[in-house]
């Protein structure tokens, strides 16, 4: 699991990258939770997503947003973090020119950034959002959502509400 330092919009971006073994394997970009609350690429959910994609043969990359770990810059309320994610995705795709599938996976704040990136990058073919903070950030830009994906949210998660309306949507519950 080699460390990679990339040039980003605000300087260095610290990354961990694993190249898939097969030519043309799919790629996945993993995005961590809120930097201002201690989120980093070493968060256990972020790390678990990274490992799962790696175990399934993907070329996968996780990184620290600006101001976290060895990444330069400072928190920018999502705008700069989106620019970081776009720069990292550019690099990931440049290392995997024959890949036909690109996935985004984000945890909390990372899911909000990932969904914004997906709306700007039509080549993203799928997503995973873990505990998307719909009560803190506006996800209305996803109507309509351009790709298929998975939203994972704990039924009793009180720190990150999935919906804020009095009548929730129907959700499939898997146990």
Where are these regions (language model features)?
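N-terminal cap/lid segment of alpha/beta-hydrolase-fold proteins
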Residues: 1-23
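Short, surface-exposed "cap/lid" segments of acyl-processing enzymes
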Residues: 23-53
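Conserved alpha/beta-hydrolase
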Residues: 54-70
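Alpha/beta-hydrolase active-site loop
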Residues: 76-95
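Alpha/beta-hydrolase fold nucleophile elbow
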Residues: 97-106
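Gly/Ala-rich beta-loop-alpha elbow adjacent to hydrolase catalytic centers
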Residues: 106-110, 114
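Short beta-strand/loop motif that positions the catalytic acidic residue
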Residues: 151-153
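Conserved small/polar residues in nucleotide/adenosyl-binding loops
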Residues: 163-168
